[in-house]
Regions:
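Solvent-exposed loop/turn segments at secondary-structure junctions
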Residues: 63-66, 82-86, 120-123, 148-150, ...
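Mature N-terminal segment immediately following signal peptide/propeptide cleavage
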Residues: 36-65, 69, 75-78
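Thiolate-centered catalytic microenvironments shared by cysteine-dependent enzyme domains
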Residues: 94-193, 210-211, 225, 276-293, ...
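Active-site neighborhoods of enzymes that stabilize oxyanions during catalysis
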Residues: 32-41, 49, 84-85, 148-227, ...
Length: 321
């Protein structure tokens, strides 16, 4: 072997080693920057290491929108469920055009990992996830498991500054009608005509008709009770009360299977206005992979409708107040 040949081989080996080293460093850097694990949830620890990741956009969707101003996850954009996720004139979800403009202002693209969180164990964050999914972004959306509750439990940072991300260009799809139940769907299920299981996720007292709505609620119905044939699995049974995190997949399967909900039939979930039921929708649809529609009209529509069948176990009668 000549000296020149040996030199060429040595140089080639060096280039290969350097290339492999660079690739290893790049892989390590990506791992540190963080691509979240596949699935519908992210952990607080992962998010805390990815707050500066340009491919991650965080949104707060809380029952109390004022929480955001008092302190939020650094870089998070506030979504007010009263105005940003609904039509403010007619009772409906936000239009595709308005939602598209809102997300472009927040810098969301087709490559963005969207992390949603909120108070009350992610009630309205899950509602947000449902709306995102309706407009074709479901695969990009993840809930921060445990929401604000677990983030604060870990004493992770909060900020009061409002971010100003670069405006993006985004085209939404949908709406995906297979994710949303209408009154006609619920009536067909109540009559046993569409082979669908209905799950009422309200409290036992609301389900039985003892209560028209939780104390302090402004959106009321003038009839109490539940959709005939509905299964009652209170939404909060799906979470760990100490952390606010979802129970394990096996625990969730057992919870719903014990109530006769095993994913073998299509499912409709409802509550009072659709926000608590979106949490159950997330558990059943995104975590367990069942075929589920959220009935966002829920009891404020059903319990105010004329002539619909109702099961009122408590016999409570509306007294006009």
């Amino acid at each position: 072997m000549t000296f020149i040949s040996s030199l060429r081989r040595a140089v080639a080996r060096g280039i290969v080693v350097a290339t492999l080293s660079t690739a290893a460093l790049s892989t390590a850097a990506l791992a540190q920057q963080g691509t979240p694990a596949p699935g519908p949830l992210v952990e607080a620890e992962w998010l805390s290491k990815n707050l500066d990741n340009p491919k991650v956009r965080v949104f707060e969707v809380s029952v109390d929108p004022g929480l955001y101003e008092r302190g939020h996850i650094p870089g998070a954009v506030n979504l007010n469920w009263h105005t940003d996720l609904v039509d403010t004139v007619k009772r409906d979800i936000v239009s595709k055009e308005k939602f598209e403009a809102l997300l472009e202002k927040a810098g969301v693209t087709k490559d963005t990992t969207i992390v949603l969180y909120g108070d009350n164990n992610n009630w309205f964050a899950a509602w947000g996830g449902w709306v995102f999914d309706i407009y074709g972004l479901g695969d990009q959306v993840k809930l921060l498991d445990g929401g604000r509750k677990y983030w604060e439990k870990l004493a992770l940072p909060l900020d009061t500054r409002t971010p100003a991300p670069a405006v993006s260009d985004l085209t939404l799809s949908g709406p995906k009608t297979e994710l949303r139940a209408r009154l006609s769907d619920v009536l067909a299920a109540a009559d046993g005509k569409n082979g669908t299981v209905v799950v009422d996720i309200r409290s036992p007292d609301e389900f039985s008709g003892k209560l028209f709505a939780p104390e302090g609620s402004k959106e009321l119905s003038i009839r109490a009770g539940h959709v005939p044939g509905a299964k009652n699995v209170t939404w909060s049974k799906a979470v760990d009360p100490e952390t606010g995190k979802f129970k394990s997949k096996d625990e969730l399967k057992k919870l719903y299977a014990d109530a006769g909900v095993d994913g073998s039939k299509p499912i409709i979930v409802y509550c009072r206005i659709g926000e608590r039921s979106s949490h159950t929708w997330y558990a059943l649809s995104r975590i367990l992979g069942y075929q589920v529609k959220n009935y966002d009209g829920s009891w404020t529509e059903y319990g105010n409708s004329v002539g619909v069948p109702i099961a009122n176990l408590s016999g409570t009668v509306w007294q006009g107040r």
